[in-house]
Amino acid sequence: MPVANNLRDCFPMIQSREEILKRINEEDHLKKTYYSWKEEERKEFLDMCTGARGVKMLYDGFFKEVMNPEYAPGRLGNFLSEVLGAAVRVKNVLPNDTTRLTDESSLLVLDIVVEFEDGRIANVEVQKIGYLFPGERSACYSADLLLRQYKRLRDERKKQFSYRDIRTVYTIILFEHSPEEFWSYPEIYRHCFGQTSDTGLRLKIPQKFIYIALDIFKKKQHNEGDRIHDRLEAWLTFFCRDEPEMIFRLLEEYPEFRALYEDVYELCRNVEGLMEIFSKELLEMAQRIAELERKLAER
């Protein structure tokens, strides 16, 4: 393990506490925002800025920047290759025309549709708080994506269209806080669903569902001595662990993640932009909690 106590030892672009506070106190609007936060929120912000803790990669502004397939297509492709258990390359980011309710959109960190080079499609979501009825909801959006693919291929190929042209549609969902059903399996963080018959008959039904419970992964990893067993677990560690010692371990075992952290810490040099990300996250978390409480009350 690297001998280091603070992430600044690995990433010298990280600013000091004094530099951050000096920048905040130079601008009245930044000072007003900073002191509008609770004391524990100010501490969390400074810890994140100064390397006392890692950045929370599931913050909307960070995740979308680091995993943006238009900026760095290999990153999302590499992650999805580990999720699917086979090498894939992202060819296109498709327009996401799926109709969503406003309250649902507020619960999503990432909602992106990508096409692989072999024509398969994946809808990738990151949810801060898992929705109620995750199976029914996923089925509806998978059906919508499948219908969109059918219409697109039919329009492109016209009389040459065949249903054999339909490629698998994957719905891949990462939960930061998993729905209660997932806690019935406290040792399993990745669940794959497909359609099978009760007779053994095999048909190609092009809908697959993969759910990854990050909170269950984190607890399981901690119980196993914080080991990183494979490259998928390396990605999940990157997404959900912000302890410096875990980041050091990840960098030692998988040094290719250094470039991702460097991108994030370059973003963090913009104190005003970072405060906007943090303020937005605080507001959206309050909205998510209120929405979850409303949905629970309706059950």
What are these regions (language model features)?
Residues 1-298:
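Elongated, amphipathic alpha-helical interaction scaffolds
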